[in-house]
């Protein structure tokens, strides 16, 4: 079970790039060390109260971190997140800049130019050009992270994988399927809330509600004769079964909660506010 969940956590993290709304801790344990990775939402200028909360998650991680890892790629403009990067440039903790997707670069000269632009933007950072797809330079990055870890007793037990409850990853898997099956406006206007999670020895019964902001979005989400929401349910159920290594019974419902991204009571219910 632990091995299955660990593998599932890795899959969720890999597939959820650019879509994380919460601060998620992933824990790596070995006999020699424990690394607590704090994955935060992408940095953006807030348009809703939801995004204000997401920005607070990212800024909170800066305060807590012993090592700051800023992940970008070869196409991102170094001036995209100016205010945030200005703060990163002043950090006293070690900063590692990870430039991903270098497999897309056609020449060494092009890569050197990209690295040079980022070196000027974050002169305090160690730069690691990487390709997660080809696993290039990933081991060197991990080795450097371990070297920078301060001496400390472990924060979590040796069997811990994350600080989030397992039902949290059910919502993440369902949200991923929404992102894959609908145009941008729909998934970014949705929130998933697990209202029932009954785990038995060989099976799990889950009831989840997908919230949207408008009646028109509800119709699009459900689809003609319920075909689209059924497809989402099938895909999500299959991945949840892989995650838990158990038979899963998944029920999905769609509800309208107008302008939920600006309502503090709903943001609190969904875990974005305390």
Q: What are the language-model segments listed below?
A:
Residues 94, 103-162:
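Canonical P-loop GTPase G-domain recognition
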Residues 11-14, 80, 153-157, 180-191, ...:
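Active-site phosphate-binding and catalytic loops of NTP-dependent enzymes
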Residues 56-125:
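Conserved C-terminal guanine-recognition region of P-loop GTPase G domains, centered on the G4
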Residues 17-19, 41-44, 74-78, 102-105, ...:
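Conserved nucleotide-binding/hydrolysis micro-motifs of P-loop NTPases
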Residues 2-9, 13:
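Single conserved hydrophobic/aromatic residue that forms the stacking wall/gate
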Residues 166-274:
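P-loop NTP-binding site
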Residues 1, 24, 39, 58, ...:
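Residue-level signature of catalytic and energy-coupling elements of molecular machines
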Residues 16-47, 62-67:
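Switch I (G2) and immediately adjacent beta-strands of P-loop GTPase domains
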């Amino acid at each position: 079970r632990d091995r299955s969940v660990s593998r599932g956590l890795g899959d969720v993290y890999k597939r959820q790039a650019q879509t994380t709304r919460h601060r998620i801790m992933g824990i790596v344990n070995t006999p020699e060390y424990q690394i607590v990775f704090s994955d935060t939402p992408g940095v953006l200028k807030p348009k809703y109260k939801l995004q204000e909360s997401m920005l607070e998650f990212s800024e909170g991680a800066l305060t807590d971190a012993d090592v700051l890892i800023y992940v970008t790629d070869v196409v991102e403009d170094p001036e995209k997140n100016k205010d945030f990067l200005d703060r990163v440039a002043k950090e006293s903790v070690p900063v590692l800049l990870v430039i991903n997707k270098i497999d897309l670069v056609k020449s060494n000269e092009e890569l050197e130019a990209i690295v040079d632009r980022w070196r000027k933007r974050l002169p305090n950072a160690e730069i690691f050009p990487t390709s997660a797809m080809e696993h290039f330079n990933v081991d060197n990055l991990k080795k450097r992270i371990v070297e920078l870890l301060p001496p400390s007793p472990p924060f979590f037990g040796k069997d811990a994988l994350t600080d989030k409850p397992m039902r949290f990853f059910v919502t993440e898997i369902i949200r991923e399927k929404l992102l894959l099956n609908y145009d941008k406006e729909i998934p970014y206007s949705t929130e998933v809330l697990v209202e029932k999670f009954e785990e038995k020895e060989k099976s799990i019964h889950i009831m989840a509600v997908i919230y949207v902001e408008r009646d028109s979005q509800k119709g699009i989400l459900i689809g003609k004769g319920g075909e689209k929401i059924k497809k989402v349910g099938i895909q999500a159920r299959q991945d949840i079964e892989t995650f838990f290594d158990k038979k899963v019974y998944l029920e999905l419902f769609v509800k309208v909660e107008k302008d939920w991204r600006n309502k503090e009571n709903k943001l609190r219910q969904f875990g974005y506010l305390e």
